[in-house]
A protein has these predicted regions:
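A glycine-rich, hydrophobic loop/mini-helix early in the fold
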Residues: 41-98
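A structured, charge-rich N-terminal accessory region that forms the first stable segment of a protein
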Residues: 2-62
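Internal catalytic-core helix/loop-beta-alpha segment
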Residues: 92-119
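Short linear loop/turn motifs
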Residues: 63-64, 102-104, 136-152
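Long, compositionally biased
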Residues: 146-184
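Short, surface-exposed beta-edge/turn micro-motifs
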Residues: 23-25, 64-66, 118-120
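Short acidic alpha-helix initiation/capping motifs at coil-to-helix transition points
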Residues: 80-81, 109-116, 139-141
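Hydrophobic/aromatic-rich, well-ordered segments within soluble, folded domains that form packed cores
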Residues: 117-143
Length: 184
């Protein structure tokens, strides 16, 4: 399988809800050694998706295993403007309000710390703040799916179902050779 096809399959599998505008962001990991043209592909797809207000950011580009963060610019900015989210992220040292570039620089710094994974990233992915806090505090969850749910399980189940439909639709299209930018 070529690098482009592999990359599109990863986008369809992990980021369909973002690409279909139902979620602020999502991420996945790739081994650089298995996809040698990954940075060129990301530049290409950033160009293809820019008119749709979707961006792809590489986190930890020096690592052998990189994190690919796909996000809707406006939705992420809206999340960051919420007072409760700002206070939450500021408690982890994020210098809010700030540009997305500054936000990602701080997130990179947090990811590079060996002590613990920065689970506050869940808020950036668009998960409900109360669910991110519940996860960090290791509470008992009510439901597990795309994220651990601590409140409003019925609403979360509806979102999980929507996300699954998006992924299946995009994966089917990619399998049939349709470019991802034509599927969204």
């Amino acid at each position: 399988m070529n690098d482009r096809r592999s990359f599109e399959q990863m986008l369809a599998c992990y980021c369909a809800p973002v690409l279909k505008k139902h979620k602020a962001a999502n991420m996945f990991h790739m081994d650089k050694a298995k996809n040698l043209s990954i940075f060129a592909l990301i530049r290409e797809y950033n160009e293809k998706l820019s008119g749709k207000q979707i961006q792809i950011k590489v986190l930890q580009p020096a690592n052998s295993r990189i994190t690919i963060f796909v996000f809707q610019t406006k939705k992420l900015q809206q999340i960051l403007k919420r007072k409760d989210v700002m206070l939450f992220l500021q408690s982890f040292g994020y210098p809010l309000p700030c540009s997305l570039q500054t936000l990602f620089a701080h997130l990179e710094q947090r990811l590079s710390m060996a002590t613990a994974y920065p689970h506050e990233i869940g808020v950036l992915l668009g998960y409900p703040l109360h669910d991110v806090v519940g996860f960090i505090e290791q509470r008992e969850c009510l439901l597990r799916g795309h994220w651990n749910v601590y409140r409003h399980p019925r609403k979360a189940m509806q979102m999980f179902s929507l996300f699954e439909r998006c992924s299946k639709e995009l994966m089917r299209g990619v399998r049939h050779g349709i470019p991802i930018e034509q599927l969204i």
